[in-house]
Amino acid sequence: MLQPQVPVAREGVPFIGFAAFLTLVSAASECEILTFIFLLATAFTLYFFRDPERFVPDDPSALISPADGKIIVIEKTDKQDFIEGEALKISIFMNVFNVHVNRAPIAGKVDKIIYTPGKFYSADSSQGAEYNENCGIVLTTNSGKKIAFVQVAGLIARRIVCWLEPNDTIQSGRRVGLIRFGSRVDLYLPTDTALSVSVGDKVRAGETILGQII
C-alpha cells in the first residue's frame, strides 16, 4: 500500500519559509556570504523535514517500524506504564539525519495518549529512557491486542508532535507525528510477539517489518 506523496512535514513549513526568506533578503542585499549561509540553512531544513513516500506492507498482522533509525534495545520489561503486565520493548534511535516523521506500527484504535513531562538527556542513554519527556500512544489492534508506541524527547529534540487523538482509528503506516532534531521511539508489545529484527538493525518507518503480532 503506497502512502500519498507529501514532500515535507507540515511542521517544517515555517522553518523552511523563514530560511528561504532570509536567503532572498541576503541575495537582494548582494551579501554573498550570508546568502550562502542561509541557502545552506534552507537546504538543511528541507532535508530534515522531508517526508518521503513509503511502501507499507499489506499484512494486517505485521508490526511495522514507527521510525527511521537504528534498533538499540530489545528486552522484556515490567517497568512501564502503558500496557498491563510484562511487555516486550523495542527502542529505535533516530539521529539528526534520519527522517523524523513517525508512522503507526499497526492498524487499530487509539485508546489513550499519555504525555509525560521530563528531562532532555541524550535519547540513547539509560537516563533518557527513564526520565525524558515523552508522549505515549496506547492502541488496541484490530486483532484485540494492546500495544504502545512512545515518542521520546532528546538532548537536541525538545519538541514532540503527535497528530493523533483518543478514539482515532488508524491504518498501519499512517503518519502520526514527528520529533524535531533526532530522538527515539519505544514500542511496548505483547511478550509473544514474533520478532524478525535484532539490536543494531537499521529500520525505515512505514516499511521495515519488525515482527508479527500473534
Curated annotation (Swiss-Prot):
Enzyme Commission number: 4.1.1.65
Subcellular location: Cell membrane
Cofactor note: Binds 1 pyruvoyl group covalently per subunit.
GO CC list: plasma membrane
Membrane topology category: Peripheral membrane protein
Marked site: Cleavage (non-hydrolytic): 182-183
One Gene Ontology term of the molecular function aspect: phosphatidylserine decarboxylase activity
Principal location class: membrane
InterPro entries the UniProt entry points to: PS_Dcarbxylase, PSD-A
One GO biological process term: phosphatidylethanolamine biosynthetic process
Organism superkingdom: Bacteria
Keywords in alphabetical order: Cell membrane, Decarboxylase, Lipid biosynthesis, Lipid metabolism, Lyase, Membrane, Phospholipid biosynthesis, Phospholipid metabolism, Pyruvate, Zymogen
Catalytic reaction list: a 1,2-diacyl-sn-glycero-3-phospho-L-serine + H(+) = a 1,2-diacyl-sn-glycero-3-phosphoethanolamine + CO2
Subunit structure of this chain's protein: Heterodimer of a large membrane-associated beta subunit and a small pyruvoyl-containing alpha subunit.
Role summary: Catalyzes the formation of phosphatidylethanolamine (PtdEtn) from phosphatidylserine (PtdSer).
Family: Belongs to the phosphatidylserine decarboxylase family. PSD-A subfamily.
Stated name of the protein: Phosphatidylserine decarboxylase proenzyme
Gene this chain is encoded by: psd
